[in-house]
């Protein structure tokens, strides 16, 4: 009898700690730069060729309500930590809070036995003065362009695993970032891995250098936004093809989203050392729409979100589930079977149950903030909480996003239907009990 109990105990212990292949997927997290929903054909976009991303949506789940912060640095802070930027005292642009370095999705992946890598954009430290920064945040391998140090596209200035990458002066940066991750996946095909592609595309070329960065070979102008969108789609396609060739696609969780909305202007060329821009309009569902990056309008915060995970997600699905940038860390944690430590102050909710078809939504509200949000109600456009339909700014303006998506008709306090009044009360309570909590 004692032998039987021992065997049963061993079985139970093993079954509680050993995850099946489907429970330990590889993860490919792709964060495009400056890409709103209107850029992708699968969201009704008509201005840019995004055939590979459109196909990805057909093979997985497309989220109608994916949101980011209105600019890149706050989004990256929230994505990595699962916490909203104001909760971390608004980390200075180009920085990361020191006491959070051990609390990122990459650190969770390492705890779960994953190999980790990042390529593309960092913007959380100057690589030349802090070469180990990505490693301290959990990324064992890295290939990142030198933000404020050199170009990201042509004649790129890239730090590879903490050392300046030599002999790449005639290369195209995005090709190198993509190939770096393909090589990483090949090397680790027999073990679980997390590859984070923080894309340079479709951000313009500017790096705040003393001299304008170079044009593409043979051109007297910079790549247009349309050309960059096509390149973005091509680079994503290269990664997806690599997963197929390595026979890893079935059990790889691929997430594609954007860090903020599309820019208001696109860079065309430089004259006398100054960059020249023109307004950027994109066509979506028959409407010409100017980008809204840095604003809290939908054009600044509503981004594509596509998830493919063949072992779990049925193809061709769409969902109205709400997702903001705090939700990715808990989602990856659940997919990896790695609990988030209770000491981590994570705001988000895992949307794995949505992917599995167990629920229609993982949360009732989402949040976005501008750089100025400090809980001061006198400042307009600093933050909002919202549902799919109703959007309440911290200054008290309420909008019905089903009938006023461009926010032309604010519903003032005491006005509107009973449904609008109920939504205001509910969302104000979220501000008071969730956002402003100590």
Per-region residue spans from a language model:
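Bacterial N-terminal signal peptides
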Residues: 6-16
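Formylglycine-dependent sulfatase
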Residues: 12, 19-394, 401, 405-437
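Positively charged n-region of N-terminal signal peptides that target proteins for export
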Residues: 1-4
């Amino acid at each position: 009898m004692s032998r039987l109990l021992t065997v049963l105990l061993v079985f139970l212990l093993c079954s509680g700690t050993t995850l099946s292949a489907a429970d330990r997927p590889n993860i490919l997290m792709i964060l495009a730069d400056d890409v709103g929903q209107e850029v992708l054909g699968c969201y009704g976009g008509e201005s840019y060729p995004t055939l590979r991303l459109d196909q990805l949506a057909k093979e997985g789940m497309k989220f109608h309500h994916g949101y980011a912060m209105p600019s890149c640095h706050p989004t990256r802070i929230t994505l990595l930590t699962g916490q909203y930027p104001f909760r971390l005292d608004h980390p200075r642009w180009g920085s990361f809070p020191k006491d959070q370095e051990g609390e990122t999705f990459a650190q969770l992946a390492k705890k779960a036995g994953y190999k980790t890598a990042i390529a593309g954009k960092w913007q959380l430290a100057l690589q030349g003065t802090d070469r180990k920064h990505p490693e301290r945040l959990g990324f064992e391998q890295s290939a990142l362009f030198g933000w404020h140090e050199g170009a990201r596209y042509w004649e790129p200035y890239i730090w590879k695993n903490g050392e300046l990458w030599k002999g790449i002066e005639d290369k195209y940066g995005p090709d190198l970032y993509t190939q770096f991750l393909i090589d990483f996946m090949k090397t680790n095909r027999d073990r679980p891995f997390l590859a984070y592609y923080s894309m340079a595309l479709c951000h313009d070329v500017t790096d705040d250098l003393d001299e304008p960065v170079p044009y593409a070979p043979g051109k007297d102008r910079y790549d247009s936004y349309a050309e960059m969108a096509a390149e973005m789609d091509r680079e994503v396609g290269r990664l997806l093809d690599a997963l197929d060739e390595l026979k890893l696609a079935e059990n790889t969780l691929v997430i594609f989203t954007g860090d903020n909305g599309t820019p208001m202007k696109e860079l065309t060329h430089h004259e006398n050392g100054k960059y020249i821009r023109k307004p950027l309009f994109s066509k979506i569902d028959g409407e010409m729409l100017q980008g809204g990056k840095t604003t809290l309008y939908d054009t600044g915060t509503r981004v594509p979100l596509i998830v493919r995970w063949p072992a779990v997600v049925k193809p061709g699905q769409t969902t109205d589930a709400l997702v903001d940038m705090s939700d990715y860390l808990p989602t990856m944690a659940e997919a990896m079977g790695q609990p988030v430590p209770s000491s981590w102050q994570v705001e988000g909710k895992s949307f794995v149950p949505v992917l599995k078809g167990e629920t229609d939504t993982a949360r009732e509200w989402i949040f976005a903030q501008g750089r100025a949000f400090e809980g001061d109600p006198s400042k307009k456009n600093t933050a909002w909480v919202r549902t799919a339909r109703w959007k309440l700014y911290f200054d008290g303006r309420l909008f019905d996003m089903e009938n006023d998506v461009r926010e032309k008709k604010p519903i003032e306090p005491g006005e509107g239907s009973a449904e609008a009044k109920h939504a205001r009360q509910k969302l104000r309570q979220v501000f008071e009990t969730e956002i402003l909590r100590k």
